Amino acid sequence: MLFYKHLYATDTEGHTDMKGRYWKIAAVCAVVALSTAALWQGLQTTHYTLVSPHLEKPVRFAVVTDLHSTWYGENQSELVGAIEREHPDAVLLSGDIVDDKEPRDAAKAFLETIAQKYPTYYVLGNHEFRTPDPEEVKDWTRNLGVTVLDGTGETVTLNDQTVLICGTDDPACGIADFQNQFFAVSRMAQQTDAFTVLLSHRPELTDWYTDAGFDLVVSGHAHGGQVRLPLVMSNGLIAPGQGLFPKYTTGLHELEDTTLLVSRGLCRNWLPRVCNRPELVILDATL
């Protein structure tokens, strides 16, 4: 009987130890899996729809922002391929495509390739203005076939729909220049019945965008708030120009008669993005 009890006790203790080891292994695996998912940097395509009375035909825009000279495959094949699969009518670039500290090769490869395929519109962000010569960035970008907007706009036909696409330099160009550019494009928007789009890098300038006459404002800059925790920090932890717990980091936001679209952007060169995959945004503007 004593021998049986000893065997039983040994077996029970061994079984308990084995269960404990299993739980520890499972916990480690869960932590690794969750960490991998949270830090995954794979490109995501996000779709939004905007309904506007100023449209008679639908128009599809691909929005690319905050690339920061990041590579997405050889010759940017991953990013370009993702855009091609969506068949946009135009590509909108809302700043920081070129980075002031990274080589320009990645930005040039993307701009040159995409401009050969789609009408492409570009405004400079704060990082382009940190380069030695922002005007030189505009010049070589235009030479690649990209339309650079700096207090200017173009009325174009996309899918048989008239659209006015305007843009301003980032306020880093100088506040007086930014004001002059913004007032110029706002006057253009208020004098047309067409669907109006403004490319402007910073989403936090909502006081400027409200009642400026644009149906849609497209921005980036916030990098999705960098660290996002579902249900806890859905807008992210921090964003330039907004500080901690920012409001405008992703998605569509109604600003009275204007809709603000914020992309989380594509940079993955710097600080890790947590629960915050880089994104290509596809916006369907429809009647």
Where are these regions (language model features)?
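Beta-strand-turn-beta hairpins that frame and shape the catalytic cleft
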Residues: 51-62, 146, 154-166, 193, ...
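Membrane-embedded segments
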Residues: 57-152
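Binuclear metal-dependent hydrolase catalytic cores centered on His/Asp/Glu-rich metal-binding motifs
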Residues: 139, 143-146, 158-199, 206-207, ...
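N-terminal membrane-anchoring alpha-helices
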Residues: 1-55
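Extended recognition/assembly regions associated with phosphoester-bond processing machinery
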Residues: 46-52, 187-199, 203, 250-251, ...
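Catalytic metal-binding/acid-base residues of hydrolase active sites
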Residues: 68, 98, 127-128, 153-154, ...
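Structural motif
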Residues: 59, 90, 163, 195-197, ...
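Conserved beta-sheet core of the metallophosphoesterase superfamily
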Residues: 203-281
